[in-house]
Swiss-Prot record:
Superkingdom of the organism of origin: Bacteria
Protein source organism: Chlamydia trachomatis serovar D (strain ATCC VR-885 / DSM 19411 / UW-3/Cx)
GO terms for MF: structural constituent of ribosome
Protein known as: Small ribosomal subunit protein bS16
GO cellular component: a single term: cytoplasm
Any single Pfam family the record assigns to this protein: Ribosomal_S16
Entry keyword annotation includes Mitochondrion: no
InterPro entries in the cross-refs: Ribosomal_bS16, Ribosomal_bS16_dom_sf
Family of the protein in this entry: Belongs to the bacterial ribosomal protein bS16 family.
Keywords: Ribonucleoprotein, Ribosomal protein
GO biological process: translation
Length: 116
């Protein structure tokens, strides 16, 4: 069961508000969700409220942010977003290091085979 943190449309005609929810990838946009993580109202002054500790928890459990939800989290909970980006950079560095080591082993094997 893949999970995403995404925006769920609410409200009425010409006054849409959104809920930031954790939902299964296969559930419809306005369908069933697992947990409410915040809301966003583009029409009011104080236009969002987020549960940053729950967002952080679910991101650590493997949930993914959609593009628009990521922008909202970046604005509303910059600490959570910064930590998420730091983890991504660290993962990329590990992959890069493994790839570099593999290429070095491969080059050594080729050099050894050419020397024979």
């Amino acid at each position: 069961m893949a999970l995403k943190i995404r925006l769920r449309q609410q409200g009425r005609k010409n006054h849409v508000v959104y809920r930031l929810v954790l939902a299964d990838v296969e559930s419809p946009r306005d369908g069933k969700y697992i947990e409410l993580l915040g809301w966003y109202d583009p029409h009011s002054e104080q236009n969002y409220q987020l549960k940053s500790e729950r967002i952080f928890y679910w991101l650590n459990q493997g949930a993914e942010l959609t593009e628009k939800a990521g922008a909202l989290v970046k604005q509303g909970a910059p600490g959570v977003y910064a930590e998420l980006m730091a983890k991504k950079v660290a993962r990329r560095a590990v992959v890069r290091q493994k790839r570099r080591a593999y290429r070095q082993r491969l080059a050594a094997r080729k050099a050894e085979a050419a020397a024979k």
